[in-house]
Amino acid sequence: KSRTSKVDKTERLNRVTYCYYFLVVLVSIFSYTLGYGYFLALAANMFSYFIFDQALRLMFNYEKNKSRPFINDASKKLNSNAIPVIGITGSYSKTTTKNVLAKILDESNNVFVTPESYNNRLGIAKAINEGFNDDHELAIIEMGTYSNGEIREICSWVRPHVSVITGIAPVHLERMKSLENILDAKSEIVELAGSVVINGDDEMLLNEARLWTNQKNVYDCSIT
């Protein structure tokens, strides 16, 4: 039997909802003022998904700027002790790779690990602000993305020294459109790193990694 998770009504969701209602009212007022009667108002209700999408677009920069101090606090906290940072991304097995690596490294280090699948900009910042402390000697950060530029933005303040890419696969194609876009988005994690570890069984990733060898230490792990 399928189940639908309960949606938490966060302040952010409330703000977007209020913006949506404002746009619907605005369309209704314009419709009546311009002599269309209730035609555009009815159309606004029929295409409410489109108006909600516009509300999300309008609120994007506001929400990003509002969260900037939160991100800055996380960056300052993580980078204050100049500890090694490992960033992990890929189309699959990010969390598993992170947990296995953390288990190995925790034998001789006090390791900070982003919990569960906290792998977006705000989730990573929340994990660092709430869980990272001066006793940690190493950090492992999982990074996910739905579009180009997201991982680059995360890396600009997480600053990974070592980057891991688990593999490239046709995941989230409804947003990413192509495997090439997925590869480009995931590859953003290597830009600031000195060393890169990749899945050596992924031919597409191997070909891309050849472009990094002059500037990075590149290691491929393979079971074949």
Ranges and model annotations:
Residues 151-170:
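Inter-motif core of Ras-like GTPase G domains
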Residues 136-151:
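Switch II (G3) loop of P-loop NTPases
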Residues 73-119:
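Walker A (P-loop) phosphate-binding motif
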Residues 117-131:
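AAA+/P-loop NTPase substrate/partner-engagement loops
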